[in-house]
């Protein structure tokens, strides 16, 4: 059996762990530049607030004290995610982390009282981390995702829904909107709706040739999994093959010297994430672009890839490569709205050397381990390369909560009276 452990309203739940006074209050979390809403509590959803809605449309609710708002705090969310995944792994070690708030798991088919196992795991995760989760078990990944949605929607499941026979599967398919099926989405869902397919059950009634002609192999995989036949299995290697850090800016930037510290910051984040997975990369790509939605303005977008001779996770090398790429593609007289850095061609574990390498890699590794230790104790911004400067000036985060779990200067103080 496959399973899904899905955190409920994850970003909001992370904020509520440290603000229990907001447990039953409407709460939203904003995107990087406080531009739009990327997470909502159930109470906020009930107010009609939609995902992706521009913040300015609901700002009056904040002013009227009817809505609580937080800027995205990804350092906090990433750390809370690791805590949740650690608890899940302690009970179900065969797992594939799918996203920051969701993981697939596998359990033996002969596990007794599977729903009880899921309910107990749900309680344990919330007790140990403060994060509520919904769990679904079924023969395939697609059905497990469906089961987790039912567990989230209906309180009677007590946090876990199990689809383990054809009767349950057929009932679930008949109740599940086609656009909500994993692998279908809104675009294909609308296309299917025009052909009379409203639910997952309607889609399963199509014959295989029809599905293949309309949607190709991905459609066949979804169609087959909805029948309870697994096609997607766990990918146990959780190391990423590429790592990207990017951001849109609140105000466009036209000056190269102002872009440099921002790109350096993205490159440093890539280096930190590489070291977390014990990886090293040779390819560093930097990209910049203007705002495509302002068609009246001059448009320009470009990227540059810099290849290093030896794979590295040294932030100094990665920042240097990213800045060389930036200087190659930067053009004056354009208003740049977004930039980012991607590292790829990642190797994990032992890094092959080069006869002509001019860097003392042993000495370098000692330095990087010292930096890792400092960052772990004092936060990811405790030590920086000078060029990073104050790159955060390009981000607008007016409502950011403290880094409760990753920065010693921001942990909660408890006073005993």
Task: Give names to the regions the model predicted.
Residues 188, 193-335:
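DNA-contacting surface of Y-family translesion DNA polymerases
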Residues 115-177, 340:
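Long, highly charged, low-complexity intrinsically disordered interaction regions
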Residues 18, 64, 149-231:
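Compact, charge-rich alpha-helical regulatory domains located at protein termini
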Residues 1-100, 104:
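Residues that scaffold, gate, or flank divalent-cation-dependent active/transport sites
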Residues 6, 48, 58, 101, ...:
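A residue-level signal for conserved active-site and pocket-lining positions in enzyme catalytic cores
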Residues 98-102, 138-141, 279-283, 334-338:
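Short Gly/Ser/Thr- and Asp/Glu-enriched loop/turn motifs at secondary-structure junctions
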Residues 105-122, 196:
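Catalytic palm subdomain of template-directed nucleic-acid polymerases
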Residues 308-417:
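Acidic, metal-coordinating catalytic segment for phosphate/diphosphate chemistry
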């Amino acid at each position: 059996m496959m399973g899904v452990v899905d955190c409920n309203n994850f970003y909001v739940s992370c904020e509520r762990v440290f603000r229990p006074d907001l447990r039953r209050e409407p709460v939203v979390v904003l995107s990087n530049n406080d531009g739009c809403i990327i997470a909502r509590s159930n109470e906020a959803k009930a107010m009609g607030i939609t995902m992706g809605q521009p913040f300015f449309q609901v700002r009056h609710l904040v002013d009227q004290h009817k809505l609580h708002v937080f800027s995205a705090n990804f350092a906090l969310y990433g750390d809370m995610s690791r805590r949740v995944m650690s608890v899940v792994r302690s009970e179900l070690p065969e797992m594939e982390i799918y996203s920051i708030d969701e993981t697939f798991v596998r359990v033996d088919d002969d596990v007794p009282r599977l729903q009880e196992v899921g309910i107990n795991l749900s309680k344990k995760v919330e007790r140990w981390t403060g994060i509520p989760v919904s769990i679904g078990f079924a023969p395939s990944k697609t059905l497990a995702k469906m089961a987790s949605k039912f567990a989230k929607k209906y309180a009677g499941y007590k946090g876990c829904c199990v689809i383990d026979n054809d009767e349950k599967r057929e009932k679930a398919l008949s109740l599940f909107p086609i656009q909500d099926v994993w692998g279908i989405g809104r675009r294909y869902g609308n296309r299917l709706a025009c052909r009379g397919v409203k639910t997952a059950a309607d889609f399963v009634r199509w014959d295989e040739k029809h599905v293949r002609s309309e949607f190709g192999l991905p459609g066949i995989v979804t169609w087959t999994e909805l029948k309870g036949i697994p096609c997607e299995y766990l990918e146990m290697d959780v190391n990423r093959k590429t790592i990207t850090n990017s951001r849109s800016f609140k105000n466009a930037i036209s000056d190269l010297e102002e872009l440099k510290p921002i790109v350096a910051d993205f490159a440093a984040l890539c280096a930190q994430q590489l070291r977390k997975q014990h990886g090293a990369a040779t390819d560093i790509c930097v990209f910049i672009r203007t705002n495509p939605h302002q068609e009246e303005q001059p448009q320009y977008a470009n990227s540059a890839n810099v290849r290093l001779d030896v794979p590295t996770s040294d932030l100094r090398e990665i920042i240097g490569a990213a800045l060389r790429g930036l200087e190659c593609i930067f053009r004056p007289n354009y208003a740049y709205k977004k930039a980012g850095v991607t590292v790829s061609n990642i190797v994990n574990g032992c890094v092959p050397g080069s006869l002509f390498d001019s860097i003392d890699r042993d000495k370098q590794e000692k330095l990087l381990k010292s930096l890792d230790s400092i960052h772990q104790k004092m936060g990811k911004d405790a030590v920086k390369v000078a060029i990073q400067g104050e790159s955060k000036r390009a981000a607008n985060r007016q409502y950011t909560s403290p880094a409760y779990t990753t920065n010693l200067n921001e942990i909660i103080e408890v006073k005993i009276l």
